[in-house]
Amino acid sequence: MTETEIKEIVQKQRSFFYTGATLPVEKRLDALKKLKTCIQKYEPLINEALKRDLGKSNFESYMCEVGLVLSELSYMIRHTPSYAKEKTVLTPLAQFASRSYKKPSPYGVVLVMSPWNYPFLLTIDPLIDAIAAGNTVVLKPSAYSPHTSRVIETIITECFDPQYVAVVNGGRAENNTLLNEHFDYIFFTGSQHVGREVMAKASVHLTPVTLELGGKSPCIVEKSANLKLTARRIVFGKYLNCGQTCVAPDYIYCDREIKDELIRQIQKQIRKQFGSTPLNNKNYGKIINEKHFTRICNLIDPSKVVCGGDNNPGALQIAPTVMDNVTFGDAVMQEEIFGPVLPVLTYDSLDEAIERVNSMAHPLALYIFTSDKEAAEKVTSHCGFGGGCVNDTIIHLATSEMGFGGFGESGMGSYHGKDGFHTFSHYKSIVDKKTWLDLPMRYQPYRKIYEKLLRKFLK
């Protein structure tokens, strides 16, 4: 798409927004319902696209993408009417007689830039929240998942006039052109490197941003944990989508006493969940492209592999891999892995683990497996991270009742459900002052009696 075409889309959306057409709640609900119906209609095409881009099975596509999108749509259709209402707040006595309230208002023209790892979910979920809040939206799906991007464009074109919601497909040139435009809000999901670029571009227009980034999400396993169940849930969360999940456990950090047994249980679970030859499992996906395939393979130290390690370059597949005797200085610990490679590191005390985790960049997620409630409380209170689980992995993002977002280097802002509505809304603080009474004490000339009254009101 050309620079001129992109500018025209943004200008038309701004003009459309200023007509007030997106403000009525009924219109927002109609848009969400239409989108839901269209997604249900195109589910087979969505599944096919996700299979071609990432090798996802239909089951995984529904569980991790389409189903979550439909759930968010249903939730926002139910709750948008209440979220969109003005919220009356207490008026101080000094402002008698008046009514004070907070009025949720859309920002205007929103840009949503989404990644390739969950290309449908991470494009449509923020769109849902932005529409519910009353905005117009420009979507920029990832060029790395072209089949899903084309299906998204088909759905959006059928559902919406481009002056309301539009899709811009393309690569780096389109990204740069979009970021040079003046949007009223930018929502970005992707790497920390690109997130910094987005924030720098947004600062030119003082545009607010939500950044959903990544990081090395630790999975702490305390010695009281149920190791069989721990292994089962770690294997699920780590190797889902071949490890290409922003909240996947990046590495295991376990008590030294239980490491060997934990690794044995993980090896068992890999065989149980993926079979003895995972690369022949039709439900096991693939790495997105050759660049990332090569990058992940280069992180694997064959001398430290205790499970997996094999790959199929032609199919861009890497078997579920576990590495033992890893140190924080190893290559695999210098960047977010974003693939099916699980390093195992050990600590001698929980305090040591907390200190180490806090010495690193704040992760998007943190997981703690333990039977000790005090240990769970200590870790979740003392460590900085976006969100996480106690005795499970990744499921904290699969609910509309809690916001999902990063912290520090892993991002800023959150979305899903009410948090998503808040993200895409500006709350105007308004005082409606009555005209039937006008107390004189704020006006000059000031008097002693007014000062006494003022001091009673304001203290």
Annotate each predicted stretch with a short phrase:
Residues S15-A21, V112, C219-V221, Y251-R256, ...:
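Short, well-ordered beta-strand elements within core beta-sheets of diverse protein domains
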Residues E3-I6, V25, E43, L227, ...:
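Residues at or immediately preceding the N-termini of alpha-helices
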Residues F160, H193-T327, V390, K452, ...:
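ALDH superfamily catalytic-core signature
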Residues F17, A21, K36-I39, E43, ...:
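Structural signal for hydrophobic packing residues in well-ordered secondary-structure cores
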Residues L93-L229:
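Rossmann-like NAD(P) dinucleotide-binding subdomain of oxidoreductase/dehydrogenase enzymes
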Residues M1-Y101:
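N-terminal Rossmann-like NAD(P)+-binding subdomain of aldehyde/semialdehyde dehydrogenases
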Residues R28, L73, G134, V165, ...:
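Residue-level signal for inorganic ion chemistry
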Residues I220, R271, Q317-K459:
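Conserved C-terminal structural/oligomerization subdomain of aldehyde/semialdehyde dehydrogenase
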